[in-house]
Amino acid sequence: GLLRRCILFITTDSGPMHVGVAMHVPVLCMFGASPIPGFYPYDERSISVRAPVPCHPCRIHECPLDGADYMMCMKRMPPDLILKYADQMLAEHGERPAYELPRPKDFETRVAEQADGSFVLAPKGAAGRVVRPVLPAGIKPHGFD
């Protein structure tokens, strides 16, 4: 019940992210060790971001790095990007709780490489139409098309 009262859910790539999507809450998800193409939120209200670090996605639940590099995938998450998307999502959906929002449209997505080398989540079969940008820098397509 608590998630359905949220106007925006900023979370990590975890179980609560999927619960938020299931409750139709706009979800802004920060990806650390997990690959975005395997675990990204799957409706039109979701945005996924990752830090531009060379070890992403390591798929390791216990970071093997030490010192300043420990958990760099989360520590180097660009705060300005998170705030930008949070502001954008609040502007799109208003400050109404999820239970007051209309049910999101269902669509299948794919990870599509753009001419500039960045990647986006786009609906399958929608030539050239971008749904949500994904922070560039090393996301590799995983055969989702």
Regions found by a protein language model. Give the residues of each.
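Accessible peptide chain termini
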Residues: G1, F144-D145
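Donor-binding and catalytic core of enzymes assembling or modifying cell-surface/extracellular glycoconjugates
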Residues: G1-G32
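Nucleotide-sugar donor-binding patch of glycosyltransferase catalytic domains
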Residues: V21-G143
